[in-house]
Each structure stands twice: as structure tokens, then as C-alpha cells.
Amino acid sequence: MQKMNIGTVLFDQSKGAAVVTLVEEQGERVLPIFIGIWEGMAIFREINRTASPRPVLHDILYNLLQGFQARLEKVVLDAVQESTYYAQLYVTQQDLTMIADARPSDALALALKFQAPIYVTEAVLATGGKRADFAVGEELREEAQAALDTSEDVRAWLENVRPEDFADPQ
């Protein structure tokens, strides 16, 4: 298993989709995962520590787990079938550990909320991981950081976005 960090979240409103990239902490591989736009916004908000106007799923799960004095110890992406990734949540409460199946988008948002480590199995990386050219990766990271530094418009949009904004114009 390889420890991963969340790299970027990219949005394509025309397709109603987002891509979250996981970057190998001690290596050169990147794992892109296609997710829904709402899930992408939840992860983007967690990265930027921007609260949602109303609690979303990972906020509710976080509050419940905290209330039961449980903790998310780690997230493991352990399978991919027909381009669908699978994640496991490792939750502990005292001496008890429970493993729960989760969508990667929810698992990643929870990992950010709990500041829990994210791991990906070698089998999953072998299937979907891409080798990242370090220079290009560093250039993209700098561009992404510059975009985040000037993202007040995006933050304002995220705070005010409504479901109707994505309605079919027909």
C-alpha cells in the first residue's frame, strides 16, 4: 500500500463531473478519480476549510463519529472494477475497529475532515495510476496553487451555488 495525498480537484461543469487526483507521497504516481461535481465541491471545500451552508454527508458522519468518540484511522482505496473505485473506512472506538465500504469521494472528504491518512493498494495503482513527470507535476502544482490563491470568485460561487444552477436548460 502506498500513502497518498490529495493533489487537486478539477471541475468540468459541462459534463457535471469532477476529477480528484491522489498523489503518491513517496513516489511519482498520480491516481485520477472521476467523481460527481457535488462530491468534488465537498472535497474542495474541505481542502480550503470552507464550511457548507448546510451539513453534507461527511459533515454528518464526522459529527456522529465524534459524538460516539470514534475516529477515522485511515482510508484505503483497495479495488477498482469497470472504472469504479472502492474505498474502505477504518473506524476505531476504544479497542474496536470497524471497516466500512464507502465511495472514494465520501471517504476522501472524511479523511480530510479527520486528517486521516489515505492509502491506495498496489493493485489499484497498477490499474489506474499514472506516472507523473516531476517537472510537469511541479509546474501543475504551482499553477494550481496560483489558481487557489486567486480563487475568491470560486469560493463565492461555491457558497452560493444551488441545484437549479445545474438544471438542464431544455
Task: Give the residues covered by each predicted segment.
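Divalent-cation
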Residues: 1-170
